[in-house]
Amino acid sequence: MALKHFKPVTASLRGTVLVDRSELWKGKPVKGLTEGLTSSGGRNNHGRTTVRFRGGGHKRAYRVVDFKRRKFDVAATVERLEYDPNRSAFLALVKYEDGELAYILAPQRLKVGDQVVAGVKVDVKPGNAMPLSAIPVGTIVHNIELKAGAGGKLARSAGTFAQLVGKDQGYAQVKLMSGELRLIRGECMASIGAVSNPDHSNQQLGKAGRKRWLGRRPHNRGVAMNPVDHPLGGGEGRTSGGRNPVTPWGKPTKGAKTRANKRTDGLIIRRRKVGKG
């Protein structure tokens, strides 16, 4: 998909750059593959804000996506490519030979009419899924499981991918886009190719309203607040805050390490590249 550049015929179109979605399906999703979705507005079950600057946005239906790809050796044909308001990547509606319909993450270079299949001994081509132990070293993959049968967890956003760089003692060595190199069990499934919509990160929304349609509210800086509202607030005139970046509750942020899962530290060969913190 290409990018659409708009002429500045109105103030809000000046500088606007959006993904051209003209090749995607223009109708509604398959009703049997959708569920109701209630907007939380960034609140938890106590009604307290757990994620700031969320709320509003267009009403959505959740598309049930098959992240597990455990229907082995049954070929499926790509019926259409669809937009999904719940994620940055596009979806592919596939129809199996037995008539079952399913949504999968659409990889790059997957077209309507293509055939995809999951299994141990299948071709290495975009959209096919197989265990990491059966994938050749050097292959670009996405939708990678961390636990066998739990469904893909890594490399699911638009344009993302990981690379299989080695295999050893039942584990696969996978290099992620963050620079992290980690071990994943060879039985875990992964899909071939990179995720669709790589131009998602190159969009310029052009106006605040388009951000509101996506459910994002205005983001207020801590240094622009009063001392009662934020550790960086206050000061006569504009200040730089006077201390390292912190959350409204005083915890270090912007690069400070927060990973606490020591149980799987041994599976990380090289940590991801991080900034200062």
Curated annotation (Swiss-Prot):
It holds the Pfam family Ribosomal_L2. Disulfide bonds: none annotated. Residues 216-277 are annotated as: Disordered. It comes from the Bacteria. Keywords: Ribonucleoprotein, Ribosomal protein, RNA-binding, rRNA-binding. GO terms for biological process: cytoplasmic translation. GO terms for molecular function: rRNA binding; structural constituent of ribosome; transferase activity. GO terms for cellular component: large ribosomal subunit. Transmembrane segments: none annotated. InterPro entries: NA-bd_OB-fold, Rib_uL2_dom2, Ribosomal_uL2, Ribosomal_uL2_bac/org-type, Ribosomal_uL2_C, Ribosomal_uL2_CS, Ribosomal_uL2_dom3, Ribosomal_uL2_RNA-bd_dom. Belongs to the universal ribosomal protein uL2 family. Part of the 50S ribosomal subunit. Forms a bridge to the 30S subunit in the 70S ribosome. HAMAP family: Ribosomal_uL2_B (MF_01320_B). One of the primary rRNA binding proteins. Required for association of the 30S and 50S subunits to form the 70S ribosome, for tRNA binding and peptide bond formation. It has been suggested to have peptidyltransferase activity; this is somewhat controversial. Makes several contacts with the 16S rRNA in the 70S ribosome. This is Large ribosomal subunit protein uL2. It comes from Acidiphilium cryptum (strain JF-5). The gene is rplB.
